[in-house]
Amino acid sequence: MTTSTLQAPTRGWFDVLDDWLKRDRFVFVGWSGLLLFPTAYLAIGGWLTGTTFVTSWYTHGLASSYLEGANFLTAAVSTPADAMGHSLLLLWGPESQGDFIRWCQLGGLWAFVALHGAFALIGFMLRQFEISRLVGIRPYNAIAFSGPIAVFVSVFLIYPLGQSSWFFAPSFGVAAIFRFLLFLQGFHNWTLNPFHMMGVAGILGGALLSAIHGVTVENTLYEDGEQANTFKAFDTTQEEETYSMVTANRFWSQIFGIAFSNKRWLHFFMLFVPVMGLWTSSIGIIGLALNLRAYDFVSQEVRAAEDPEFETFYTKNILLNEGLRAWMAPVDQPHENFVFPEEVLPRGNAL
């Protein structure tokens, strides 16, 4: 008589780590968490440190921290000095040579926040891929999140890479972002760029679709309970629909003459519109990085220059852009020591 014993296969360290990372817990970690959590922690921590303590006097000639008297709307982690070019500004690099205070003064925190922030966003998208696979659903959440990632990377990384230095990227702050928007308008005529137009249409169109969808569902909820409001009548385990798609279709058919009759197509459209808006605006920013022009109506500018009585909204905007450049550049780029004589400052028919 012979007996045999089956030994359990030995599990390597990778399998043990894989099980631990994917364990069911309140906050899922996963393999993506190894990228997401450290980089997000460092990016947010760097931003809080910069807005609290670090001045922008040496890079922009500005006060930008709570310590100097700025508030939540005016504080920022400012871009590095123009002289730094596209240096990664590593703490141990030749610019700072391990001196933390000097590193902060040169704008090293901005490079730190931008780099770790980009990897944190990528980690968050990978997190959505990972959880989608584990739960057994399609990865459209992650695909949609590529929109914000495209905007962040194009605005904060690709645009300044196309310009002379990181200095021309947006600083991380509310008022600082507004300054960057004015800069894009004055130097690139951004609002007339077709990719900006598509971006606006996508974002506002997505908001409109979301509002229409929300009110339509609320309007067509089944009266299926005796409670004071319809929310309490909902049961997460109910098998039947909670609203009437047929009634919604009938309503919008009467309003517009057309309506969605397919829920899957409807929700894909709600996904597609805002994400395409983010993607197209990102493409436009890449164009600005290369200083590409869009919609220069030179014939109107020439006629306006020759005829004092001829002016269009376009020519008026061109004059406003000239004003932005002329009055903004000396303050925005103090290191250039710009001095514009009075006779070159823009004057239009209405200015």
UniProtKB/Swiss-Prot annotation:
InterPro entries xref list: D1/D2, Photo_II_D1/D2_sf, Photo_RC_L/M, PSII_PsbD/D2
Membrane-spanning intervals of the chain: 39-59, 123-139, 151-164, 206-226, 277-293
Residue sites binding Fe cation per the record: H213, H267
SUPFAM superfamilies, sorted: Bacterial photosystem II reaction centre, L and M subunits
Gene3D superfamilies assigned: Photosystem II protein D1-like
Residues annotated as binding chlorophyll a ChlzD2: H116
Subcellular location: Host cellular thylakoid membrane
Keywords: Chlorophyll, Chromophore, Electron transport, Host membrane, Host thylakoid, Iron, Magnesium, Membrane, Metal-binding, Oxidoreductase, Photosynthesis, Photosystem II, Transmembrane, Transmembrane helix, Transport
GO BP annotations, alphabetical order: photosynthetic electron transport in photosystem II
Enzyme class, first EC level, given as a word: oxidoreductase
GO cellular component labels: host thylakoid membrane; membrane
GO terms of molecular function: chlorophyll binding; electron transporter, transferring electrons within the cyclic electron transport pathway of photosynthesis activity; metal ion binding; oxidoreductase activity
UniProt cofactor note: The D1/D2 heterodimer binds P680, chlorophylls that are the primary electron donor of PSII, and subsequent electron acceptors. It shares a non-heme iron and each subunit binds pheophytin, quinone, additional chlorophylls, carotenoids and lipids. There is also a Cl(-1) ion associated with D1 and D2, which is required for oxygen evolution. The PSII complex binds additional chlorophylls, carotenoids and specific lipids.
Residues reported to bind a plastoquinone: H213, F260
Subunit structure: PSII is composed of 1 copy each of membrane proteins PsbA, PsbB, PsbC, PsbD, PsbE, PsbF, PsbH, PsbI, PsbJ, PsbK, PsbL, PsbM, PsbT, PsbX, PsbY, PsbZ, Psb30/Ycf12, peripheral proteins PsbO, CyanoQ (PsbQ), PsbU, PsbV and a large number of cofactors. It forms dimeric complexes.
Entry-linked NCBIfam families: psbD (TIGR01152)
Protein name from the UniProt record: Photosystem II D2 protein
Organism the protein comes from: Synechococcus phage syn9
